[in-house]
């Protein structure tokens, strides 16, 4: 029974998503329908947290625009997500970057990671 549930969940998960980690800056494009029309909206931000697993996995993105910090959460396996593009890799020592919430400007920056990403999780 448990194996059957895992198989069903694997079928619903997307395989076209790139591998990204907390601290990376990504550009996430989502489909939005307004007034009967559909358009694509792009949100670029730093990955603050990845929660859950399987079909219910979510990602929280943080971005500073016009001096105000914004935070948005997205379901990774949602059919509304059109594409995910990695802009730059970040070098962090935390699994959750909630300390970015109160920061603006240079304090909200994450150091860029240069080098190969390890395959360990």
Curated annotation (Swiss-Prot):
This is Large ribosomal subunit protein bL19. PROSITE patterns: RIBOSOMAL_L19. GO terms for biological process: translation. This protein is located at the 30S-50S ribosomal subunit interface and may play a role in the structure and function of the aminoacyl-tRNA binding site. Transmembrane segments: none annotated. The gene is rplS. GO terms for molecular function: structural constituent of ribosome. Belongs to the bacterial ribosomal protein bL19 family. InterPro entries: Ribosomal_bL19, Ribosomal_bL19_CS, Ribosomal_bL19_sf, Translation_prot_SH3-like_sf. Keywords: Ribonucleoprotein, Ribosomal protein. NCBIfam families: rplS_bact. The keyword Ribonucleoprotein applies. One of its GO terms (cellular component) is cytosolic large ribosomal subunit.
